Every structure is written in C-alpha cells, then in structure tokens.
C-alpha cells in the first residue's frame, strides 16, 4: 500500500539521487526512481523495498517520448507525485573551452537542460493536480552563479536551471506548487569521475586535502525543502563546505 507522499527522483543510480532515495525512504515516502543503469536501480530497489514501496524506471531523460511514456505508465499507487527532484545531470571536460570536444558540450546541454525540461513538462499536470505541498527541486550548482575556469557549458547549463526555476515559480503562482534551485558546491560523488572520463587520479585530486560535502548532505537539504509547511517556498539554496569559498577574479599576468 502506497504512503501518502511520493517522490520522483531522476539520476537515482548514484550520488545525490541515490542518497535522496535513502533519506526519503527513511521518512516513509514512496519512491519513483529513474536512471539509465538498470542494474543499479534494481539493487537500490532491493535495498529499500523492505522500508517503502519502490518503483524503478530505466530512463534516459534526454528522450522526451520515453519520459512522457514513463510518466503515463506510472502505477496508480505512484501516480500522485508530491515532489519531483530533477537530479540527473553531469559535467564533462574540465579543460578550457577551446580544448573541449563539441560532443561533450552537446551532451551536457541535452542532459542538464533538455532532460530537466522533459521531466518537468511531463510531470507538471500531476504536480499541479496535487496542489498545495507539491514541490519541484531542481539540482543546480554554484557553477550556475559563479564563473571559474573549465566551467564553460556546464556552468551555463546550471545558470539555465537557476533561471528556469525562478521563471517556473512565477508561472506556477496560485497552484500551490513550490520550486527550488538547490545549488551545491564541491561534493564527493561519482560526478567528478564522470567529468574526468574515468581518470580516478584526477578525480581524487579534487578532494585531496579538503573536506567536501557528502551526497547525504545534499539529500538532507532536499528533504528539508520538500517538507516545509505548504505556505513556504525556498527559491534557492546555495550550499558549500566550510573549506570552500569563491575564487578571486582570474588575471592574466606576464
């Protein structure tokens, strides 16, 4: 039997998404978990199914038809989505823009922008129908607010997430649906290994000598946002570890 609250999490096979699944399950929410790696989804389902109902969807958010079909096919016990967490996203190629493969830029846009739009569009009718207490939590990044070398299209895609969240919030005024841009700083997840295309040494180097955020740190922020009183909306949350701050402006010197 489904609980009264259902969360739909994209990119649930690792990192923030996987941690969020655990946090929401611990609180008794039913889970709709999507991702491209089915075996990881199945493992997560097997882990959490003793706590709460779990529905998994092998899904590429870049494919709008597949997204629409998956939403239309949600079982009745999972159809009344309370919270959407648009977590699926990635960064590729931290090199300077002039050294990056164009396909990497396109992949980031297709996932971070188009994928987020596809899922949001498909679930808006459900969220609006739910009304008061429904939430959309879009996972942005400090890269969408603050420039740094190697951020190029990744930072621009997260700037889109921020502005889309603000604009969507305006459009949804009066529906009871909340919208939040959650922007993490440096966090130790699979994200960096993907960005370096499997270079474990380069990935490890980013975290060496410091204390980054954990995936659970961000998952707990998601849960806090999703469980606010119905009359409250947090527009944006920017979270950094204590040992991270803003970089100085870049200067070219002789």
Swiss-Prot record:
The active site is at 154 (proton acceptor). PROSITE patterns: ADH_SHORT. Its EC number is 1.1.1.313. One of its GO terms (molecular function) is oxidoreductase activity. It catalyses: 2-hydroxyethane-1-sulfonate + NADP(+) = sulfoacetaldehyde + NADPH + H(+). Substrate binds at residue 141. The keyword NADP applies. It is an enzyme of class 1 (oxidoreductase). Catalyzes the formation of isethionate from 2-sulfoacetaldehyde in the deaminative pathway of taurine. The enzyme is specific for NADPH; NADH is not a substrate. Homodimer and heterotetramer. Belongs to the short-chain dehydrogenases/reductases (SDR) family. This is Sulfoacetaldehyde reductase.
